[in-house]
Amino acid sequence: MSLNIPPKPEESLWTDDQWKAIQAKGNNVLVAAAAGSGKTAVLVTRIIKKLIDESANLNVDELLIVTFTNASAAEMKFRIGKGLEEALGQNPDSAHLKRQVALLNYASISTLHSFCLEIIRKYYFEADIDPSFRLIEPIESSMIRDEVLEGLLEQEYGIENNEAFFHLVESFTGDRSDAELHSLISKLYDFSRANPDPNAWLEAMVNFYNTEEITSITELPYFPIIKEDIELRVNQAKNYLLNAIDYANENNGPAPYLATLENDLVQIQALSELNWSSWTHLKTSIENIDFKRIPTLKNKSDYDEVYVEEAKKFRDAAKKEMKNIATDWFSREEVNYLSDLEKMKPDIQTLSELVKKFAANFFEEKQQRGVLDFNDLEHLALKILLNGDKASEVAQNYQKQFKEVLIDEYQDTNMVQETILRLVTNPSEAQGNLFMVGDVKQSIYRFRLAEPTLFMTKYQTFQQDGSGNGIRIDLSQNFRSRKEVLDATNFIFRQLMDKHIAEIDYDTAAELTLGAKSPETNAMATELLLIDMKTEDTETEDELSPQELQKNQVESRTIAMKIREMIDNKFPIYDKKLKQNRPIQYRDIVILSRAMTSAPDMEEAMKVQDIPFYANNNSGYFETTEVATMIALMKVVDNPYQDIPLAAVLRSPIIGLNEEELGQIRMAKKKGYFYDALLAYKDITVSETADKISDFVQQLNNWRELSIRENLTSLIWQIYQETNFYEFVGGLPGGKQRQANLRALYDRANQYEKTSFRGLFRFVRFVERLEIRGDDLGTAKTLGEKEDVVRMMTIHASKGLEFPVVIVSGLSRKFNMRDIYSKTLLDKDYGFASSYRDVEKMIVYPTIMQQAIKQKKSREMIAEEMRVLYVALTRAEEKLILVATVPDFEKTSKNWLQVAKEKETILPAATRAKAKCYLDWIGNATIRHSAFKELLCEEMIQTLATEMKLQIEIKTKEMFLTNELERAESDNWLENIKEHQPVPIQSPYKDEIQRYMEYEYQNEAATEIRAKQSVTELKRQFSLQDNWSDTTLLKEFQKVSLDRPKFLQKNKLSATEIGTAMHTLMQAVSLDYKPTKEDLEQLLRTMREKDILTDAQIKAINIKQILDFFESPLGETMLQKKDLVKREVPFSYLLPVSELYENVDIDERVLIQGVVDSMIEEEETITLIDYKTDKIEGRYADWNAAEKVMKERYHIQIKLYAEAIQAISGKKVAAAYLYFFDGQHICQINTKEGL
């Protein structure tokens, strides 16, 4: 059919393929858009052109535009709006354009989940749900799910004679718990939801175990997987033998081996003529392979030792390959493999029914709570859009409404989403209106059950001329990256990707072509940095082994030093906004990694090089000391009878006990809970430790009561305040980060309380489940990712982004194979597979289905990882740097040389399929580059024609592991110092340190004066010292602490504490009437009940002195003018330094703070009254003598009070009085005199 593409204007900047994508119509369109090909711009332009064409009679609300993320949807809507406004600016009278601008906010431009939500909100009655439902977050959904699942299992256990269920439990769980069954049901539920009809998929899962009518394994639906695997491995064995024969044929090669090797090869080649219709024939053919003993070389000196060893090594590899085929596929008889599946069928049937029950119960529970989760949206939308297996009336209405449906990132859709899109698009193939954009090479979300085969099927059936089921348009030109980056990517992936292994051919249509030209330079050549670890043992290492940790450290230091070198050398970067080169900045650099396990090492390495660093890490939050301590404390508040959390809290800075003290507590009660021992120790011991424990127990009881009365956030904040733990961690190294983590804990508790769950117990349980499942939350961020920092993120997080310089790290980290080697495997095509467990004999056998699906999942994982690597390499705009460690470069390069003689561009299938890490692919690909040939001086390397610029640098770990050398040097220096000998090395910072030591600060006088002082402190500086004075003038607005310092607790109250108690009572006494003794005693009882005053403080208060005050002229005045009285008035006041210190001549001001006990504020004047508890009677000869001392002591204080209050209020301080409780003396202070 004709594409009806209008001619491209000569002035157009669009490529021919981009123009086709913008203009194509009349059929479904698939745009295969390579990385950096401008797909978003094409998509937006297509939409805008359609909308501004008034002859098309298209409104924006007649388009459905689906994006992958909310951010993408917002950006899409913004770009369309901007385009419409520009068009309206050129044609301001257009009613059509005005209408489009007005309709834009009502247009369906969103994620598919949001579109489904829109359908449900509008047609809720079709799905039979409450329209007032609330959409919940995954956290709340998981908590409801766990409750429902536990309830279901408990119900099943309670059913009498439920033999099928009990057999299932015995078959799939351990002896101690049913956690495995719990997890299996949950996994199956999630997996089934990726299918349009989950129940149908679960039922089909059971049918794969129906083998009654099957007589041979070759009849099983998944036999093609088995055949493919055997063929691949036989071919690999053949290649091993061919390599061995090549070495035997070399000059000085082990020629006597040739006859044996050729006989081996004949046997292997004969397997290519196998009868694949008979499993018995296959088994016999494989088992009959006979590798004869290789002959002994008589004169070994006549042969090259390397050739001899290589020939032996390759033959042994071939023997091992054939042995593995026999072990994996033919270890049991055919009849046993088939009978195992039949025996498992009842368990699988029970499991299927159990998952269906759970799904129904889970949905019912959410309905009762009036909530839905994200997984419900797609399936409820499907329920509304489907009528049986046909489009419902609602779906038909959408088909009429949407004149075109456009979907971005189509390669990441699943079967449910595909069905929804099909139901709202035109069902006629001849008039298809679905426009899909994506790149299957960037499909990296299989773990989210994305289905890249949907894209591939259309890619293979759609034709570029539109003659097939739709139109296919390839956008291969890359406008993001320099030629150096594209050449490197193409060179590697031409050798890696084909339909067999990667599910797509990397042909001329798929490879990247240069779109934006820039001058070539060697500085932009792709770099491969290999760090030779020499002694590493890759046979036994895992991701958390000491070897792997050391690899992370070395790699991190390599990268940090490389970044420091680029920054210091002002590496030139082309700035697209400035349209010119500029020196590189930290923000230009990103470090990409498959996982973030090396982030802490990377951060440490960056600190050493003084490089600002931001790691987008979603783990490590619960492991931080401050968060772990708070979680432990909350567990103890919830239930103190938990030994480990209790010990953690006691040992933490909150309580501060040491190991010896913890041991003493346990000795108080050797058996039972540690909390009982704690209580026993408190009661039988008199010590400082016992006092600490007593205080803690009282505080713990208060928190436990608070946890019942108040919400969770109130409890957490109260703990922060009472323990000062938040302030404490702020003073530790990394204090800002630690405080951010504690704030995040408060925020997350607040979010939790907004769910349908409440309370401390549930929150603690929720956190425990997150920890068990490994669902960490990620530490709080104190540095924004948009700042001038080097960023580190996962490759998945980088998808859709671009960076001037990309450093890909962790290339030698092993692929995550946990899912493949899991006890149970799930597959979209074949359902569920696991080992067969004979519960009577307690023997476990691998099933043929399990082996087949394991191979299938392994191939899918390899294809996915290949696409992940493609995404990583295509993020770079200017420069690509690849960093990896190798256990032994000499041995590793020899392994790569095995494929160096290959003449085909594509690497052998087995080499690609058996890769364990990215470096296996990159090494085997780049070994055929001329740069490697020059490095290794190996003539046997068959280099491939390429324009890729590659710089290879081999480093050793000793270049980076300097700590040991530095420690040895420091030990030598220490010996020199002990012997009074000079240190042989002079610090390079000597001159800089000298400058610091000799520096004189110009405003030194200001450093001796505090920027903020209390009036009390000033009074001390300018007046006589008196231990009986009340010096607590700066009062805090918080609950009075009942805890006295430990060294004072056994003594009577100090004069200061007595004064504080008197002031507290004076603040609380009512001025409505003259108080009596009974009034004051009742008030004190109330204050004790509210924990405002302690028993000791009440006992120390002299009630008679309080009563005497109200008999004095000042007291009577306060009672008469009660409405004008203000008590405990705080103030802050800036005062010039020169007014405080006569001999200091600097232009600075000091912040003065204080609290006025009482003041009578009239219309124009203020009277100040300050209470004093100084000892007067019996200490001075008479009041005249005392008054002179008191005026001198308190003159500064009252003068500052008066000046501050007068300045703040704007009213004159008419009088200022001191009232002394001891002796009922009144002293008036002249506030006009100088300081």
UniProtKB/Swiss-Prot annotation:
Single GO MF descriptor: 3'-5' DNA helicase activity
One GO-annotated biological process of the protein: double-strand break repair via homologous recombination
Keywords of the record: ATP-binding, DNA damage, DNA repair, DNA-binding, Exonuclease, Helicase, Hydrolase, Isomerase, Nuclease, Nucleotide-binding
Covalent S-S links between cysteines: none
CDD domains in UniProt: DEXQc_UvrD
Nuclease is among the record's keywords: yes
Keyword DNA damage: yes
Binding annotation for ATP: 33-40
Domain UvrD-like helicase ATP-binding: 12-482
Swiss-Prot/TrEMBL cofactor(s): Mg(2+)
EC number: 3.1.-.-, 5.6.2.4
Residue span(s) of domain UvrD-like helicase C-terminal: 509-800
Family label: Belongs to the helicase family. AddA subfamily.
Function noted in UniProt: The heterodimer acts as both an ATP-dependent DNA helicase and an ATP-dependent, dual-direction single-stranded exonuclease. Recognizes the chi site generating a DNA molecule suitable for the initiation of homologous recombination. The AddA nuclease domain is required for chi fragment generation; this subunit has the helicase and 3' -> 5' nuclease activities.
Quaternary assembly: Heterodimer of AddA and AddB/RexB.
HAMAP family per record: AddA
Descriptive protein name: ATP-dependent helicase/nuclease subunit A
Organism, scientific name: Listeria monocytogenes serotype 4a (strain HCC23)
Lineage per the UniProt record: Bacteria, Bacillati, Bacillota, Bacilli, Bacillales
